[in-house]
């Protein structure tokens, strides 16, 4: 009989491989690219997750944000902050974004536990860095980020229109509750 830690390690690698395949496999149509030029120093800091295409790791979370910090090697240390409900304490998950050369800082390979790899593509950022649209070349996942946790409906619709111009099916996006009164409202997770 194999020790339990060998079986656990094998299971983690297998699950990581499945996730990496699902997160990076191409969608129908040409792969998405970005022409954005990102000033990494301005991009660092807290970004609230206003909306996303829900998937297992973020589905059902509330009051979420990503906090980015540039490390000495030029990589981006990321802390995902979330709550399972507004009554629960904050929890965090960490990852490392490796900025890809020649991408104008817009394309990162993100590693979770060094086993799982995902694409991170900054499609567009506001001139004042108040919001950012983030996706993947496959268009499987997407996020609306903002420096402020509150975003009015008109601006949100405008940003979804930008995602549509990038070839996304915007009906797949759902807003993330940042405030207790948003829970259960139409259009929110």
Place the predicted regions along the sequence by residue.
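A beta-rich soluble binding module of mature secreted/lumenal proteins
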Residues: 2-189
């Amino acid at each position: 009989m194999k020790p339990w830690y060998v079986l656990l390690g094998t299971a983690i690698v297998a699950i990581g491989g499945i996730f990496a395949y699902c997160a990076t496999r191409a969608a129908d149509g040409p792969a998405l690219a970005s022409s954005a030029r990102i000033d990494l120093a301005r991009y660092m800091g807290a970004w609230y997750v206003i909306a996303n295409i829900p998937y297992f790791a973020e589905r059902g979370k509330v009051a979420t944000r990503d906090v980015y910090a540039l490390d000495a090697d030029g990589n981006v240390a990321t802390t995902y902050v979330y709550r399972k409900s507004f009554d629960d304490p904050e929890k965090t998950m960490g990852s490392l974004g490796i900025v890809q050369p020649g991408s104008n800082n817009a394309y990162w390979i993100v590693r979770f536990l060094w086993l799982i790899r995902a694409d991170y593509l900054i499609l567009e950022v506001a001139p004042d860095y108040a919001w950012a649209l983030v996706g993947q070349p496959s268009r499987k996942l997407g996020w609306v980020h903002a420096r402020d946790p509150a975003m009015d409906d008109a601006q949100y619709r405008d940003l979804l229109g930008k995602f549509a111009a990038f070839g996304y099916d915007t009906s797949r996006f759902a807003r993330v509750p940042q405030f207790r009164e948003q829970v259960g409202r139409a259009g929110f997770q």
